[in-house]
């Protein structure tokens, strides 16, 4: 069984809004070993919800929060599928890195730039009983 401190999972989605890409890697001595990958396809309704939110100038807190939580659950499901595929247990995972799904990105507006990602990292950590690292910037 692998040392818990050596296995990390990374999650990424892109502007194509089609899927979550997941990777599991093991850090050992001075090497990085690929354990495996998994692509988790978004359902059509999820894609529509994300695209809709990306295009709106004004969004209700309920709409934002519901999609944030839904994506947190989907990220957790993608991790579970990856772990099942490669016989990994939550106790083996040191951390999960998740950037989230970008829905607004304005790096150079008149004030200070900003970027907003969805995919509630608290839900991800709770559902998987592990630590996560998120750069949820609002």
Labelled PLM ranges:
Residues 61-118:
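Short beta-strand-loop/turn "lid" adjacent to the catalytic site in phosphate-handling enzymes
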Residues 101, 125, 129:
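Cell-envelope and extracellular/periplasmic
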Residues 129-138:
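Single conserved hydrophobic/aromatic residue that forms the stacking wall/gate
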Residues 12-62:
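Short glycine-rich, Thr/Ser-proximal phosphate-binding strand/loop in the N-terminal lobe
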Residues 3-8:
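Extreme N-terminal starter segment of soluble prokaryotic enzymes
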Residues 24-31, 108-122:
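A glycine- and small-aliphatic-rich helix-loop capping segment at beta-alpha/alpha-beta transitions
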